Every structure is written in C-alpha cells, then in structure tokens.
Amino acid sequence: MKKYKMVINIDMLRLFLPLLGGSVSGSLFGRFLGSEGSAIMITTCVSFCALVVFIFGLFYFRKKGPLKRILYLFLVGFVLSLIRIKVVYLLGGQALPLLDPILMYAVGAGALLGPNGAESSATWEEDSFELDVLGESFSSSKTDMDSQVAEAPQTEEGEPSVNQVPQEAGASHRVGPYQDQGLATDRNGNPIDLNDSLPPSSLLYGEIESSASVRARDLELEKDIKRVQRLTRNFDNAEDPARRLEVAARLDPEVRELDQKWALFQEKDASGLGR
C-alpha cells in the first residue's frame, strides 16, 4: 500500500511540474518580451499546451478525492487566465483595470495595499514629481544646446565658424556674382582665366619630346649593357686562348663605346638641370 501511494505522489509531481513550468513561462513571456505580438502568441501556445497536458492528467487520475478537486480548481483558474489573455489581446490595455477587480472578487482577495497602507487603484496616476524632474532635465539640455550654438568658436586661422550665417561670417565667405554662374573665382571674388594658368603648347611638346628621348636613351643603354655582359661571360667561359683573344678584341671596343655614351648622357643631363 505504501508503494502504491509513493507511485501516486510521483505521478502527481510529473503532472504538476509541467503545468507549473508552463504557467510560469507563459507569464514571463507575456511580461518581459519586447514584441507584444510574439508575447501574446507564445503565451497562448504555452497555455494551450498546458491545457492539453492537464486534460490528459485529468483522465489519468479517475479517482475521487482531494487530488481531483485540486485539478478542477486549477482548471478553473487556468481558463480564467486564458480568457483574460484573449480579452486583453482584443480590447487592448484598457481591459486590464476592468478584469482585475472581477478576478480578485472571484478569488476572494481584497484590494492591494500600497506602501503607506492605503489601497492602490488599478488605474495609472501621473506623478507630479516625476513630471517636474523630466521637465527640468529637458529645459537644461535645451539651454546647453543653445549656449553651444551661440558661442560660435573661431578656428585656429581666425576664420569664422561654420555655424554662423553668411552675413556674419565675413567678407571671405560672401558669395560673389561670378560664383552664382559657376565660374572659377579667386579669394576676392574675381573671375580666373584658366587659359592663363596653363603652360604653353610648345613647352608641353618639348617636355614630351624630352621624355621620349630619355626613354629611348635608356633602352639603348640597356641593350649595350646586356651585350657587354654577354661578351664578358663568353670571355670567362672560353678555355681556348685564341677564343679568349677574339672575345677580348670584341669586348674592348664595346666597353669604350659604352663609357663614351654614359659620359655624354651625363653631360646632357647636367646641362639640362643647369637651365
């Protein structure tokens, strides 16, 4: 008989723990989720799952007694909570103060007491102290912003600040008549002739020709250096004395010619820099 009672107690715990967890999680999801729609959906789903578990548990415990009374009491409270959720969802937040007294009266509890012992009403009342504090903070922040704009600090070069209007900014920031037409102007507002700032065409052509000649000279020097290097390798690799003399006879004029070209190009570069 004792073993049978122990089995009943374990089965009762298996029944009530999911119901308790479902009710607590539903209330938490309904209170603390950021999205109201997701909170309502999750709370409804959890409540429906808890109701299904409760129905299966009710059919499981077919005996009469205090356990079945507790299950009936839980069913009534659960249905009332589900109705409250649906009514709040349909009517909005205004249905909360209307349903709370009805539920309190049905349960048998009195009105909640505040910190000073007085009964607290279900409706929200404005707190004058909180409104005054919010008003003072808003006014102080607004005055700070106005003072920062009115100071209009100068830059390091003494130019007026960007926050100033064009009339107060000075002569350097006044819009000239040519700026409205999209023309380039100087600091005084006078138009600038872009053709005067461009170099003459002869100078440009001279620079192009000089750059082309320098490029051709570099290519010529590179070819001569490669030819001298090839002859030097042939001279080092030649084992026959006659072959070495032949390569040396060709290498000496190439080296002298390369030295003359290098000296001539250096002289031209020096004369060009002197100009």
Swiss-Prot record:
The chain crosses the membrane at residues 15-35, 39-59, 70-90. GO terms for cellular component: mitochondrial membrane. The keyword Mitochondrion applies. It comes from the Eukaryota. The keyword Zinc does not apply. It is found in: Mitochondrion membrane. Keywords: Membrane, Mitochondrion, Transmembrane, Transmembrane helix. This is Uncharacterized mitochondrial protein AtMg00670.
